[in-house]
Amino acid sequence: VSERLVLLLSGPNLNLLGEREPEIYGSDSLAHHVATAVETAAASGLVVEHLQSNHEGDLVDAIHAARGRAAAIIINPAALTHYAWSLHDALATFDGPVVELHLSNPNAREAWRHTSVVSPVATGTIAGFGGFGYRLAVEAVIHLLSP
């Protein structure tokens, strides 16, 4: 396991950040948020590897590949949060901290967004802080990986 590697996963439609519903998700692009995570991690000697996919199976494959390789996972599962049991099961096999991340606060939105199938296998969840959540998620990983 690389004690320096953090896998950052972004789910469906996050490639459209900055264009899609900016009143909810803000005007910054996914690339901007990833750069924030990379910079925050680098300041503590960590390396972020990012994957965005609109396909659940790609994210599951990335989680499987991270086993024995990455020290931690940060995941913004987007809409998959609410029904992607395959993500839940894959994350349950990962032996390291998992931080669930959301730009908005799902519990302050529509009722169908109130259930997360990721939360039961996450070490913790950061939600509702917009783009600042990416910095917070990396800081949480730094804390969780500290001896």
What are these regions (language model features)?
Residues V47-G57:
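Short beta->alpha junction loops
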Residues A84-D95:
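Short Gly/Thr/Asp-enriched flexible loops that form oxyanion-binding sites at enzyme active sites
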Residues P12-L14, A78-T81, S104-P106:
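Short glycine-rich anion-binding loops that position phosphate/pyrophosphate groups of nucleotides
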Residues H50, V99, A108-P147:
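Short, glycine-/small-residue-rich phosphate/pyrophosphate-handling segment
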Residues D58-A62:
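Short acidic active-site motifs
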Residues S2-V6:
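Extreme N-terminal starter segment of soluble prokaryotic enzymes
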Residues A66-I73:
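Short acidic/histidine-rich motifs immediately flanking catalytic phosphotransfer sites
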Residues L17-H32:
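Glycine- and acidic-residue-enriched helix-capping/strand-helix junction motifs
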